[in-house]
Curated annotation (Swiss-Prot):
Organism the protein comes from: Shewanella denitrificans (strain OS217 / ATCC BAA-1090 / DSM 15013)
UniProt entry tagged with the keyword Phosphoprotein: yes
Name of the protein described by the UniProt record: Acyl carrier protein
Pathway: Lipid metabolism; fatty acid biosynthesis
Protein task: Carrier of the growing fatty acid chain in fatty acid biosynthesis.
Top-level division of the source organism's lineage: Bacteria
Gene name per UniProt: acpP
Positions of post-translational O-(pantetheine 4'-phosphoryl)serine modification: 37
Domain Carrier: 2-77
Length: 77
């Protein structure tokens, strides 16, 4: 597991209060991990802070799964 993947998963676990084993690459924040719209906004803000980047709203809307978050951060580091 890459350092970025580990960091993204750690943020998801902390922000959504889910178990590590539930945070699979294909997991949807809303459908699989029980996030609501506020959770997803806070999750994006936590990713921005952790990786010292700004995620535009139109990009943030596309980050709906664990893998999408990992991919976005990996491409925009």
């Amino acid at each position: 597991m890459s350092n970025i993947e580990e960091r993204v998963k750690k943020i998801i676990i902390e922000q959504l209060g889910v178990k590590e084993e539930d945070v699979k690459s294909a997991a949807s924040f809303v459908d699989d991990l029980g996030a609501d719209s506020l959770d997803t906004v806070e999750l994006v803000m936590a990713l921005e802070e952790e990786f010292d980047t700004e995620i535009p709203d139109e990009e943030a809307e596309k980050i709906t799964t664990v893998q999408a978050a990992i991919d976005y951060v990996s491409k925009n580091q």
